[in-house]
Structures are given as structure tokens and as C-alpha cells.
Amino acid sequence: MNSNSSVQFNEQGVPVSTTFDDIYFSVESGVDESQYVFLAQNGLPRRWLSLPAHYSFTIAETGFGTGLNFLLTWKRFLEQAPANTRLHFVSFEKFPLSRQQLEQAYQLLEPIAEFSQSFLEHYPATDPGCHRIILSQGRVILDLWIGDLNELLPEWLPQAQKQIDAWFLDGFAPAKNPEMWQPTLFDAMKQTAHSGTTFATFTAAGSVKRALQQNGFEVQKVAGFGRKRDMLCGHYLSAEVCQKYYDRRDVTIIGGGISAACSALALKHRGVNVRVISAGSADGASGNPQGAVYPLLHAEYTPLSRFYWQAFSTATSFYRNFCDDHWFPVGVMQPAFNDDRARRYQRIADELYAPDTVRYLSQPEAEQEAGVSLAVPALLYPKAGWLRPAAVVKSLLETAQIELIEGEAKALEKTESGSWQISLKDGSLLAAERVLIATGHHINGLLPESVNPLPIQPVRGQVSLVQTTPLLSSLKTVLCFKGYLVPEDGNHHCVGASFNRDREDLEPTPEDDEENLKQLAENAKQPWAESLQLTSQRVSVRATSPDHQPVTGAVAENLYVITALGSRGFTSAPILAEVIACQLTGELTPLTQDALRRISVSRFKG
């Protein structure tokens, strides 16, 4: 599924596409070219100076290439836009460069070196789909869509109506890359334009000029950069004033786990006043001592795999940004304990995903990577890892600087104005403009009678903590089998977890500890997995849905839910929080329409 660009570097060090026989940026000065063609001809940074508070200025680009336009725009925005505004940059790229190719290209881009190096730290694996990267403490968002523009635009368009403030039409020249300059693109520009939308492109091709005019744009031909004589720029001609919509009304979140914390931060980034009601932070599974973050990948490229891969891509960048002290990207390994599993793992690694996402390791390679003895080959997620759940939740809530109300919500009642009244168990009442419920398997207990219950199933899980040993202390990666084993933290390892459907009891049992340790020993079949000393345990209840997908979205006017994150809550919470925050504020989500439907509350209706 991965399609990297064929690139060579000429004598000047400029990257050249061998596919399109064209350079990625000017030999004279790529930075100056980008500044002149794309920023200046779109009226930037001048237009930023008059943006209203909390406005998200949104740019769409065709052809991410080396990311030069994004990097320069990011730099200029931080330097010159009002501090209470945000930048959302959406870029489409069919042939992504590898990290190594970017590193080489950036050697010529010294004026933006600080930003190029920061971006490289977050550059994702180049698998298809949208990679959402949150930068500059949430003030800048990059949505990097990998794939064919003509296939991606129809899935992206429904949520992008009148949302784009400026278009950067890059990519290679129409004569060399005609597949990109199709009616699909120009129709998308028309649908996403509002009264203030502008565009700029390096080309002056007559076919491009005519297509833009036919789709409602006034087109100007101006002097090109350097040796190029002409280029095109212009703005959308709207018969009526059509303004971009955005909503910043207050939100009250009920819940104290990872989905609540991520949602609070995502909303706070967008200028929304947020308060969180919780009996205590890091409740439920979010309070476990250690947790693994890795995707769910199948031997076929299924919608479920696609969602969890995308969630994983967002999560690893997110935790690096906001919880670096409690995030350990040491890799996650899935040993292949039988031949059938080995064949499936090899197909996943060799045919479906990029090496930066997943690699198949022989038995000696797996043993060396894990740091402990292993008898079988394994699948390795090199960018995955583990975190400290309670510390992560606490850190996110502190970063968000939101109002935290200690208490337990008992009921919700809709008011005549369309807002909500929240009753707490201590008898107090709170008024809320909008409410987001993030209480896991308890969610149906808070839904008003007018809302149909959601098909959420509780799953009880017990994790066991064991004392480290001389053999076990050398474990470097998370090991996942039917359960999991996490590297040492404070002389202890977390072993988990039991899986008991339709149980909500929170009392630990010796039987579950015995099963966790037995399962580890039987799967590993190694001396380090034997005679482990149990030190403590913890029980929590996860929420799951019938189709194993999370559940998000509106259940009533001004009432939203986020639940059913299951056993991969720390993998999916960051992207789900972005989705719900975008839906609440009127911004672009990082998911396709199909993916949004699959996690929507509405899939259970009818």
C-alpha cells in the first residue's frame, strides 16, 4: 500500500523527481520561491493580521513534496499572526518522500532549519491516509493526506465546504503531471471556497487558468519567480457573502479518563472554555500503572485496521508533544507463536505497510530487539511503546488549564434554551451550554430518557504487577501475545490483562493473577517468564461496542459522547478527541467520510 517517490539529487543538491522529470524547488532559493509564489500571492502574512480571535486559518495544498511550503508558512505564521489565532494546513501527496530524502533536501533550506528539524521528529510513516500532526502547543495542525488526490478529495470534501482560506496549487507542472490537474481538483476548490478564499500557483498554463475561471475564480497572471516569466493567482468570486463557520461555545466534559483529558486539551487549543467533572482523574483503565500504545493491524487492509493505524500515527506524535516525560517509544513486539501467525505477520510487514510502521523480524533479530530470549520470530512496531496512564492524564489536564470540578454526575436534563442542567450526587446543579460525556461503560446511566441507550458492553480486566528479575530487567520492548508484558518501571513490570465480558466488579481475584502469569509463561516458554513474584494488581472496566469501533458524536442537541475505546484507549483517544473537537467547533477532522460513519453514534440508529 506504500508508494514512495523516486527521487535523485542533482549537482546542486536539489531533489529531482525521476517520475515527473522535475525539481522539487528552485535551485536559486527554494525558500524565496515559496515566499513569493505561495505566501505573497495569497496575501500572506498581511491577511493574518486582521484575523478574529481563535480563528483557524486553513490552507489546502496539492503536492506536499518536501514540505517546504508548509515549513515556511508555519514559521511565518508564528512570527506574524496574532497569538490567539491558529493555522490548519491540509496537504495531499501521492508520492511521499522518505525521512532520509527529506533530511538530505533540508540541507539546502537553512533559513527554516529550526522548523525542518522539528518536523522530522514528527514525520510519520508514509502509509496511505491522513496523518494529523499537532505542533507548536496545538497552535498549528498539519493534516498530511497520503494517496491519490482524485480519490481522496471526494472523501474529504463533505466536511470541507467553505472551509479553505487559501489554496497552494503546487505539485509538478500540468504537462508533466496531468493526473493531478483534473476537474476533480477545480471542483473541490469551488466547493471549499468562501468569500475570502484565494489561490496561487507557479504555473501559467492556459488549461489551469480556464478551469479556475469556470469554477468561479478571478484569475490574474503575474510575474513568476526567478527565471519563470508568469504565474497565476486570484480569489473566489462569490455572488453572496459566504462566511466560514466556527463555534467556540463553552463545553462541559463529564469523565476523568484519557478520552476526557485529550478532548479537554483539543477543545482548549481551539479557544473553547472547558470544565471537567470527575470524581477523580485517571479513572477506569486510565489509572493502570502502565499501558501499551500500538495499532491493530490485520492481514488485510480493513477499515478497522486503517482506523487504528491512523489513530496510532496521531497518538505517537501527540504523546511526544504533550507527555514526553511519561511516554516511552521503545517499540512493541508481537511474537509469532505458531506458523499461521508468522505467515500473517510477514504479509502485514511485507505487503501492506511501510517499514517505519511495522517490520517482520527473524527469531535472532526479535531476540536482539527485545533484549530477552525468544524462541520465535515477531512483528515489531518500531514507533510504538508504553506510557504511564495516570501521569499522562494528569499532565494533559494540567496542560489544558481547565476548570476541574470534583464530583460525580448523576443526571442530565435539557433546558428550554437547548442547553443542559447537570445534577451531581452531592445535590448541586450545574448549567452547561454543551456537554461531552466520556464516562466509558457508565455512559448510558447519564443519557436522558429521550436518547436511546448505546450498545456498550463492559469488559472487566485485571492487570498484575510483578517484581523485576535479573533476566526480566533486560526487556527493552513491550511484548504482546494474548496478554502483554511491559518493560520495567520502578522495579516492576505490568502483566495483563484478563478479559471478562459483562462484568463490572472491581475486586481483584487471585484467579486472574494466576491466569495472567500462566498465559505469559505458556506463550513465552522462556526462563524469564517463570516464577515471577506478584506485588500488586488493579482492576478496571473497559467499554466496547459490537463492531469493536469507538463511538463518538452527537446524541442530542448540544450533547455529545465519546466511548467504547476498548483495550486501545490510549491509542485511539488523541485522534477521537481531535474528531470531537473539530465537530464541536466546525473544523476539518482528520478522517474520511467512511471512517467518520464507522465511529459515529448514528450507525446504531434504525
Curated annotation (Swiss-Prot):
UniProt region (tRNA (mnm(5)s(2)U34)-methyltransferase), positions on chain: 1-237
Entry-linked SUPFAM superfamilies: FAD/NAD(P)-binding domain
Keywords on record: Cytoplasm, FAD, Flavoprotein, Methyltransferase, Multifunctional enzyme, Oxidoreductase, S-adenosyl-L-methionine, Transferase, tRNA processing
Main location, first listed in the record: cytoplasm
InterPro entries in UniProt: FAD-dep_OxRdtase, FAD/NAD-bd_sf, MnmC-like_methylTransf, SAM-dependent_MTases_sf, tRNA_MAMT_biosynth_bifunc_MnmC, tRNA_MNMC2, tRNA_S-uridine_synth_MnmC_C
Annotated compartments: Cytoplasm
Pfam families: DAO, Methyltransf_30
Domain of life of the organism encoding this protein: Bacteria
EC numbers, comma separated: 2.1.1.61, 1.5.-.-
GO CC annotations, alphabetized: cytoplasm
Cofactor(s) named in the record: FAD
GO BP of this protein: methylation; tRNA wobble base modification
A GO molecular-function descriptor: oxidoreductase activity, acting on the CH-NH group of donors
Region of interest (FAD-dependent cmnm(5)s(2)U34 oxidoreductase), residue spans: 254-606
Reactions catalysed according to its record: 5-aminomethyl-2-thiouridine(34) in tRNA + S-adenosyl-L-methionine = 5-methylaminomethyl-2-thiouridine(34) in tRNA + S-adenosyl-L-homocysteine + H(+)
Function of the molecule: Catalyzes the last two steps in the biosynthesis of 5-methylaminomethyl-2-thiouridine (mnm(5)s(2)U) at the wobble position (U34) in tRNA. Catalyzes the FAD-dependent demodification of cmnm(5)s(2)U34 to nm(5)s(2)U34, followed by the transfer of a methyl group from S-adenosyl-L-methionine to nm(5)s(2)U34, to form mnm(5)s(2)U34.
Sequence similarity: In the N-terminal section; belongs to the methyltransferase superfamily. tRNA (mnm(5)s(2)U34)-methyltransferase family.
Full protein name: tRNA 5-methylaminomethyl-2-thiouridine biosynthesis bifunctional protein MnmC
Gene from which this protein is expressed: mnmC
